[in-house]
Design a protein with these regions (language model features):
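Long extracytoplasmic/lumenal interhelical loops at the membrane interface
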Residues: 281-349, 368-374
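Hydrophobic transmembrane alpha-helices and their immediate junctions
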Residues: 2-4, 349-389
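Membrane-interfacial entry segments at the cytosolic side of transmembrane helices
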Residues: 124-135, 218, 255-268
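Alpha-helical transmembrane segments of multi-pass inner-membrane proteins
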Residues: 129-155, 168-234, 241-252
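N-terminal hydrophobic segments of proteins, predominantly signal-anchor/transmembrane helices
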Residues: 16-27, 41-119, 141, 386-392
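Hydrophobic transmembrane alpha-helices of multi-pass, membrane-embedded glycosylation machinery
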Residues: 38-46, 208, 225-232, 240-253, ...
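A membrane-periplasm/extracellular boundary helix in multi-pass inner-membrane enzymes
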Residues: 80-87, 144-155, 251-292, 313
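Transmembrane alpha-helices of multi-pass inner-membrane enzymes
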Residues: 40-48, 382-389, 396-446
Length: 446
C-alpha cells in the first residue's frame, strides 16, 4: 500500500512536525530539553490568542475549551500551589521557589500545555503519527552507528553540551552518549536521545501507539520495528511488558459496546474467579522473576520507595518537601522518589500533588474510554494514556514530559472531538431506514 502523502497545512502543524523530525539534530547540540518547553509555551500562547478571538482569520479561531483540558490545567495549577506551599512551610527561600517554579514550567506544566495545544490548535493527529514514524526510520538507520560505537569502545559520553548552563535536572539531559554500560552487570545498554535507557523505551512505547494508527502500512511497520528494537537495546523490562499489554488492552477497551467483547469478558471474569488461586500463584512467580531479572535495580527502587513513603508520612504529608533530595549511599545517592511518579509526588508535593496527577489521569481515561468506542483518534490517545499510566510506576513523568509531548498533543486533539454514541447512531439508522421503507410503501400504493 502506497503511503498517503501528508504535509503540514498550518503554522502549528509545521512547528510540531519539524520539531519532531529534528529530534536527533537537537540531541546532537544538547538542546532537546530546552526545545520542548519553548515550543510548548509558544504554541500555547498562539492557541490562547486564537481562543480570545485575535486570530486574523475567523475560521481559524479555536473551539470551546474541553472540560478535560480544564481538569488538566487546574490539576497542574495545584501542583504549583503545593510546590509554593512546601517552600513556605520549610522556609526554602525565594531563590529556590523561583527555580522550582521554572522547573514546574518545564515539567508538570507541560502536562497541561500540550493537551491545550492539541485541543485548541488546528493540528491533525495524522501529522503527529507520520512525523513520529519518520523519526522512527531515522532511529533505525542510526542503530548500526550506536552499536558500532560500543564495539569500537568509543568514549561514553562523547561530550556534555554547553547548553547545560541554562539549568536542568542533571548533566544527563544535555550529554551526547552513543551507548552506556550497566554498572550492576556490565551489559551494554542504549538510551538513544533519552537521558537513560528505560526512558528511551518509554518514548518508543508511545511511538508504537502512533504507528498502530498510521494508515500507511509501510510507516506502520517502520514504527513497530523501531519500538521493538529500542525496547530490546534499552533492556527495559517494563517496555517488554507494556508492548503486548497496550495492544491487548486497546483491543478490549475500544470494543466495549460489542456483544462479543462483553460476552468474552463475562466468561473470562467467571474463569478468573474459579481459578483465583492458580492465577495469584502465577502472578507471584512472574513478579519474582521480573525483579530477579535486574535484582540490583529492583533493590534500589524498593529502598527509594520505602524512604519516600516513610519521610512523606512522618514529615510532610500535605504539601510534601518541595524539592528533590538525594538518597543515602545505599541507593547510590539517587534522588528520593525517582523511578516512580507516585512516590516522587508524595515526597515532593505531598497528597495534594498525588491527587493532582491521579484526578486528571482518571478523568482522561474515562473520557477517552467513552470516545474510543467510535473514534479512531480517541483510540490512539487512549493507548498513549495507558502507556503513560504504566510508566508512572517506573519513571518520573515530570522530567520526561519534554520527550513524550507528542502523545500529550494527541490526547488534546482527542479531547476536542465530540462524544459519538455508536448505539444511538445504530438506533437512528434503523429509524431512518424504517421511515424510508414507510415512504416507499406509501409511494408505491399511490
Amino acid at each position: 500500500m502506497a503511503a498517503p502523502i501528508l504535509h503540514p497545512e498550518t503554522p502549528e502543524e509545521n512547528i510540531v512536525y519539524y520539531t519532531i523530525l529534528w529530534t536527533w539534530g537537537f540531541w546532537v547540540i544538547g538542546a532537546l530539553y530546552i526545545v520542548a518547553p519553548v515550543v510548548g509555551w509558544y504554541l500555547a500562547y498562539r492557541a490562547l490568542l486564537r481562543y480570545v478571538g485575535q486570530s486574523s482569520s475567523a475560521c481559524m479561531r479555536a473551539p470551546r475549551i474541553p472540560f478535560g483540558i480544564i481538569v488538566w490545567w487546574v490539576s497542574m495549577g495545584a501542583m504549583l500551589f503545593a510546590l509554593v506551599a512546601a517552600h513556605i512551610s520549610f522556609d526554602l527561600g525565594l531563590g529556590s521557589m523561583l527555580k522550582s517554579s521554572i522547573g514546574w514550567a518545564k515539567g508538570w506544566g507541560l502536562m497541561a500545555v500540550f493537551p491545550w495545544i492539541g485541543a485548541m490548535s488546528p493540528i491533525r493527529a495524522e501529522i503527529v503519527y507520520r512525523a513520529t514514524n519518520k523519526l522512527a526510520l531515522q532511529t533505525l538507520l542510526l542503530v548500526p552507528i550506536f552499536i558500532g560505537a560500543a564495539l569500537a569502545h568509543l568514549p561514553h559520553p562523547l561530550y556534555v553540551s554547553p547548553l547545560q548552563i541554562v539549568g536542568g535536572p542533571g548533566p544527563e539531559f544535555f550529554r551526547v552518549e552513543l551507548y552506556s554500560i550497566d554498572e550492576t552487570n556490565g551489559n551494554l545498554r542504549w538510551s538513544f536521545f533519552a537521558p537513560w535507557s528505560p526512558a528511551a523505551a518509554f518514548i518508543a512505547n508511545v511511538s508504537l501507539v502512533f504507528a498502530l494508527y498510521d494508515r500507511s502500512r509501510f510507516w506502520k511497520w517502520i514504527g513497530v520495528a523501531c519500538c521493538v528494537v529500542v525496547s530490546v537495546l534499552s533492556q527495559s523490562r517494563l517496555a517488554l511488558i507494556a508492548i503486548p499489554a497496550v495492544v491487548l488492552l486497546l483491543a478490549i477497551f475500544c470494543n466495549l459496546t460489542r456483544p462479543l467483547t462483553l460476552g468474552l469478558a463475562s466468561i473470562l471474569a467467571t474463569l478468573g474467579l474459579l481459578s483465583a488461586s492458580p492465577i495469584m500463584s502465577l502472578v507471584d512467580t512472574f513478579t519474582q522473576r521480573f525483579n530477579q531479572a535486574r535484582a540490583a535495580s529492583s533493590r534500589v527502587r524498593a529502598v527509594l520507595r520505602s524512604i519516600a513513603l516513610h519521610r512523606w508520612e512522618s514529615e510532610a504529608p500535605i504539601f510534601g518537601h518541595g524539592v528533590v533530595e538525594k538518597g543515602p549511599h545505599i541507593v547510590e545517592h539517587m534522588p528520593i522518589g525517582s523511578h516512580h511518579s507516585w512516590y516522587g509526588l508524595l515526597f515532593v508535593k505531598g497528597i495534594v500533588g498525588f491527587a493532582a496527577l491521579a484526578v486528571p489521569l482518571a478523568w482522561t481515561i474515562l473520557e477517552l474510554l467513552v470516545k474510543a468506542q467510535a473514534d479512531r483518534v480517541a483510540r490512539c490517545a487512549l493507548g498513549v494514556v495507558i502507556i503513560i499510566t504504566f510508566y508512572t510506576f517506573g519513571e518520573n513523568l515530570e522530567i520526561l514530559s519534554y520527550l513524550f509531548w507528542p502523545g500529550l498533543v494527541v490526547i488534546g486533539i482527542a479531547m476536542r472531538r465530540r462524544v459519538f454514541n455508536p448505539l444511538r447512531c445504530r438506533f437512528e439508522r434503523l429509524q431512518a431506514s424504517g421511515a424510508e421503507g414507510t415512504q416507499l410503501a406509501h409511494g408505491s400504493s399511490i
